[in-house]
Amino acid sequence: MNLIFAAKSLLVTRAATGDSWHLPDSSQLQALSYQSSLIQPEGINILGSISSDVDLSPFPELSLVNLRQALNFFGIEMVEKIIHAEQMLFYQNTHRYCGSCGQPTSLSASGKWLHCSSCEHEIYPRISPAMIVAITRGDKLLMAQANHFAPEMWSVLAGFCEVGESLEQTVHREVFEEVGIKIKNVQYWGSQYWPFPNSLMIAFTAEYDSGEIVLDTNEMRAAGFFSKDEIPGRPSTHLSIASRLIDDFIAKH
């Protein structure tokens, strides 16, 4: 598996026939200048990065595709490897210098982490816990549009955990802050690592308890309860845990 990233885009090649996309083979990358990863995840042959404004005109078979879109091209096992590899590159690119003493970092003896040889500070990848919740009110699901969503995109509510909070506290706080309602019967549903930017998504289900929807307009464009036949839009990536929560609601109603 050969993975070349440019920020949050993935280098892919179009199949000879049809509209499917594949990862480039080694021969297609021989003449391409890229920066190799210090860390080499298992199962990855080539891992590297290029500039987002790189000139790919000498390589007509290659294209940069937004990572969210690219994840729709592959099965779940490959998606997990792609996410892991991209996050290891992100980790290296954002931890080039020690946060303790300011000296350049280098690869640890294990080959898996970065460390500072000057002050012996160990630097590990940042993982940001975030909740995501499917809230039902009878046979309807709460769906919302964040201000940064594309017009056709809707999803369930999500938000990052704050220092000192339990996950359950995060669920209640984020829901009330974003749409102004109270919920009950919060139950763990599942989890997924998601590289936007470095989130461990912890999914829950919950039931509406009280209140009327009042949007935090700094974050939300719209929100409402919808039956399975009224769902106004979907997340952009079908393998995301947000999509799977919506699919679970549809299957049960």
PLM region descriptions:
Residues Q145-A146, A158, Q187-Q192, T217, ...:
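Active-site proximal loops enriched in glycine and acidic residues that flank catalytic Cys/His/Asp
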Residues Q192-L215:
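Active-site-adjacent beta-strand/loop module that shapes the phosphate/pyrophosphate-binding cleft
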Residues I83-T136:
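Cys/His-rich short segments
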Residues W113-S155, K182-I183, A206-Y208:
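N-terminal strand-loop-strand
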Residues S155-G190, F204, E212:
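The catalytic Nudix box helix
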Residues M1-N93, A150-W154, F196, D216-H253:
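Nudix hydrolase/Nudix homology domain
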Residues L142, E162, P232:
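Nucleotide phosphate-binding site architecture
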